[in-house]
Amino acid sequence: MAFSKKTRQEAITKIQNEEMDLLVIGGGITGAGLTLQAAAAGMKVAVLEMQDFSEGTSSRSTKLVHGGIRYLKNFDVEVVSDTVSERAVVQGIAPHIPKPDPMLLPIYDDEGKTTFDMFSVKIAMDLYDRLAGVDEDSPYANYTISPEEVLRREPLIKKKGLQGAGVYLDYRNNDARLVIDNIKKAVEDGAQAISKMKVIDFIYTDGQISGIRARDLLTDQVIEVKAKLVINTSGPWVDKIRYLNFTRPIVPKMRPTKGVHLVVDAAKLPVPQPTYFDTGKHDKRMVFAIPRENKTYFGTTDTDYHGDFTDPKVTQEDVDYLLDVINFRYPEANITINDIEASWAGLRPLLGGNSGSDYNGGDNGAVSETSFNAVVEAVLRYKNKTATKAEVEHLLNNMESSLSEKGDAPSSVSRGSSLERESDGLITLAGGKITDYRKMAAGAMELICQLLEEDFGLKYEPIDSKKYQISGGEFDPTKVEEVVAENMKVGVAAGLTEEEAKYIADFYGMNALQVFAYASEMEAYEGLSLAESARLCYALEDEMILTPVDYLLRRTNHILFMREGVDAIKVHVVNAMADDLGWSAEEKAEQEKALEEALRESDLSDLKK
């Protein structure tokens, strides 16, 4: 399926000449998921993104499909139940992206009041497994380990006060890949998806929005697109879209916060599995340290943000905070700013009335001390075989019902998100977590189908989005390893090494077969390996890359987790893209400059001076 700069102008022409049923503003995970569901239902749908797909927020997360175990500190059962249930759905529709990766949660007794102790962490993990449907005999069932075992796994971790640790199931994620594979499936189903296209104005008919004006940031051309419905899924930008033309008095919905992550070499901070721990600053926060691609990254911060949404920066204050936290937890590592190889800063699109972040918990829906004690007692009785599993489930189900949002307004799609239609017809889908994206889109689809039928006489049926697999994920989710092994053979036959073929098969899912097809047909680009050349060719032909940063940062993880290799290939990537996309000498120089700026920003060169 071609999805490239070559097809981009065709899409622009098409949306100018045909009225869309639905126009989606914002190509992050929420807009991508909604566009896929709309296209699969047969709608004429277009999604416009002013940057690269996922560039604004959705590629800047902690890169987990996180179960939110910290919420169980307050027994916010409904949040965790929703999250782990939806996580299982996402793993089923995108089995090549979220991968199980058990999390280690160390426990200390010398740091004052902490999130968990050894007793409460076991209770929380048992509840977590029950909510996640993890059986006791599953290889992913939770367990506790001794201080000695913790130190065997992580010899640099703080020894004083260590009581042991809990280990429970969590999932690593490739956030940018999740977005682009939703977009690609939507395009395959007939959607028009255009990046570098900024919505600048609304078109009105009789006081109702009937389309948009947008500026093509590649050509500066302004286009008009007619649409029956327009939905705003622009993440932290939703208020800015709502403010366009100042046509409506609005109450701001968003309270964005900034999260920062830092990357060091695994030799400097050897962490064999994801680890989740209190900061030690008595600020009621927890931080992750996560291994990936022979690197370890750690974060996140969580601070209110009022700066430039397009490109939030890592500040010295952010670095100081995270270095203090990581060196407190791993005192022998002695990490300094000069050890940082890469970094990223992103915004969380939190609703103003729901400022507790995805990772740091909150007291929304917290239960009373009485309910807390009742649950603990029930679980202990179950462990001692004096209560049945059904009795525990009955208690939890009653608690979930009391905490659920069933009594809320219909506009509430899920906790931390909202769906509203304003007086001029603009629909806004805001807030939420990456894990919630499919569920949020499904909730919006119900409203969209209703409006299209009532107002325009068009009848569409939403798809079963719980089973509709995204691009690259079209295989049995219980057979990930078998599929990778089988596809890997194709890569080896195409001339790649076993290591290269396995990496690509794991990274792209079923789309690896197209990467391998390019490898078998092409000569390697000058200065690049055949594997790198095939990946770049695939990104150019099928993944709408328009800049070197699109490829090196979001379609791959090179800038974040293979920083030492980027300098060796960056010139050759630019040269290959310049030839393919027909850049002039001036355009090529601009792209080289933009890439160098992105690298300097990522490796914190300005702060290291």
Curated annotation (Swiss-Prot):
FAD binds at residues 21-49. One of its GO terms (cellular component) is cytoplasm. Keywords: Cytoplasm, FAD, Flavoprotein, Glycerol metabolism, Oxidoreductase. It is found in: Cytoplasm. Its EC number is 1.1.3.21. One of its GO terms (biological process) is glycerol metabolic process. One of its GO terms (molecular function) is glycerol-3-phosphate dehydrogenase (quinone) activity. This is Alpha-glycerophosphate oxidase. It comes from Lactococcus lactis subsp. lactis (strain IL1403) (Streptococcus lactis). The lineage of its organism: Bacteria, Bacillati, Bacillota, Bacilli, Lactobacillales.
